[in-house]
Amino acid sequence: MRLSPDTVAAERDWVRDRTPVVTLINDVRSDLGATFGVEVAPVSEADYRAEVDAVFADGDLAVNVAALVALLRDLDVEDDYPGFVVDELLGRELAGMIAGTQPLRLLGEATFHYADVSHHPEAEREGGAEPAEPAGVDDLEAALAAGFQTRLPGWDWTDGDSPFAVE
């Protein structure tokens, strides 16, 4: 793999245009909100795109996010199962990277596993048709959903200053 500013821009454009991820973000937010008994604000496509732009505006973060996106977009292992650990590892890392610094990073990583388990695009194919995309793409979508849902506003506990800040 060769990364350049043009490659990073191309991966940003792919992520930015992957707006069906917004549905997964909102499904995850709704499920987690119900689990924890809280209301979580939904995310719009405009919110998602703006946050993608924010992630890719940080060059050091952008090149690493772009590398993981490119790897997952192309990852396909014959019979898939042997590649299960690889796509989980890359997806978890991508979700954490997008989510931000601790504790958001850990929440993004944990949320990746939830999003991944609940996201089954292969089940949506008709008549057992072959997948249109490599196996890593569903993990990529779960990682994008987990990372961006974690970093975007909408969770009450992230509004305002922490009560644990010491002045």
Language model regions located:
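N-terminal interaction modules that seed assembly of large macromolecular complexes
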Residues: 2-71
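Alpha-helical protein-protein interaction elements
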Residues: 6, 73-76, 104-106, 140, ...
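Short, structured coil/loop segments at alpha-helix boundaries
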Residues: 18, 95-104, 129-137
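Long, charge-patterned amphipathic interaction tracts in eukaryotic proteins
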Residues: 46-120
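Glycine-rich, aromatic-bearing surface loops/beta-hairpins
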Residues: 111-167
